[in-house]
Amino acid sequence: MTFSNNFHRLETRLQSQVGRAIGDFNMIEDGDTILVCLSGGKDSYTMLSVLMALQKRAPVDFKLIAMNLDQKQPGFPEEVLPNYLKKLGVEYVIVEADTYSIVKEKVPEGKTTCSLCSRLRRGVIYRTAKELGANKIALGHHRDDIVNTFFLNMFFGGKMKSMPPKLATDNGDHIVIRPLAYCAEKDIASYARAMEFPIIPCNLCGSQENLQRKKVKEMLLEWERQTPGRIDNIFASLRNVVPSHLADTDLFDFNGLTTGLAKIGEDALFGQTAYDQAPLVFAGSHDDRIEFVRFERKPGDKSAEQAVPGEAAAN
């Protein structure tokens, strides 16, 4: 398989982003055994490929075990992943659990099955990780998934919450990591096409994509078309949270806020300009008038300032 220079740049970018996410969130440590969950889709294939590449030059020693859950969906190509993983030379396990029949039994015809299916799948994954002695579980969610989930929770759940790059399971037995947290879906799709991964369709169960999630995804794609880089900025905001400028009393002690405390960023209260602005200083007051004047710095003098008379900020 011959790759272009563009592909090598893409591969380098993905590996760099995954490496940075691993470092920023301390996702992988020496001695870890990581269960890498494979669905047969572009995201999980890319995750495994990048993790295997990074494993070869990582400063710490860790073990990867690829896992696929055969949920007994009609038409599931059972031989695709085992053949691919054997060829790849990675340790793997195929777990068989008939969650499909349970979902079909519990969910009314025509309703979305994804929520129940996800819960059942999660339980099987956790039990498998325990059985194999894996302390970390790697999932293939990427940057766009994280942003999408953020808006879903905000619009339909009234919470500022998303998929964290790293979290502990409820019972505390395992750490879940999302190594693709910094990676854009379009880059992953391009990489998967170039690598010619044997993609397994995600709609074998016959369930339709969640309508709310679909609408949010379409909204984000339209925003990105209108203003390229917007999704990057939204994701960056998830990493730059200022609790004092939100409204959650559990995150910030608004009741205890008083004068005399260190400033918490007045720019966010009154608006921040993108240009240098000469300061206005108090000049005096008389009758019903208060006057502020603008100061200008003398050329070459960073400390001295000279007033410009007659320019009042308040009339």
Swiss-Prot record:
Domain of life of the native organism: Bacteria
Motif residue range(s): PP-loop motif: 39-44
UniProt-annotated location(s): Cytoplasm
Cofactor(s) needed: Mg(2+); [4Fe-4S] cluster
Residues given in the record as [4Fe-4S] cluster binding sites: 114, 117, 205
Alphabetical GO biological process terms: tRNA thio-modification
Keyword tRNA processing in annotation: yes
Keywords: 4Fe-4S, ATP-binding, Cytoplasm, Iron, Iron-sulfur, Magnesium, Metal-binding, Nucleotide-binding, RNA-binding, Transferase, tRNA processing, tRNA-binding
Broadest EC class assigned to this enzyme: transferase
Cofactor binding description: Binds 1 [4Fe-4S] cluster per subunit. The cluster is chelated by three Cys residues, the fourth Fe has a free coordination site that may bind a sulfur atom transferred from the persulfide of IscS.
Family, as annotated: Belongs to the TtcA family.
Note in the entry: The thiolation reaction likely consists of two steps: a first activation step by ATP to form an adenylated intermediate of the target base of tRNA, and a second nucleophilic substitution step of the sulfur (S) atom supplied by the hydrosulfide attached to the Fe-S cluster.
Subunit structure: Homodimer.
Protein role: Catalyzes the ATP-dependent 2-thiolation of cytidine in position 32 of tRNA, to form 2-thiocytidine (s(2)C32). The sulfur atoms are provided by the cysteine/cysteine desulfurase (IscS) system.
Annotated protein name in UniProt: tRNA-cytidine(32) 2-sulfurtransferase
Organism: Ralstonia pickettii (strain 12J)
Upper classification of the organism: Bacteria, Pseudomonadati, Pseudomonadota, Betaproteobacteria, Burkholderiales
Gene: ttcA
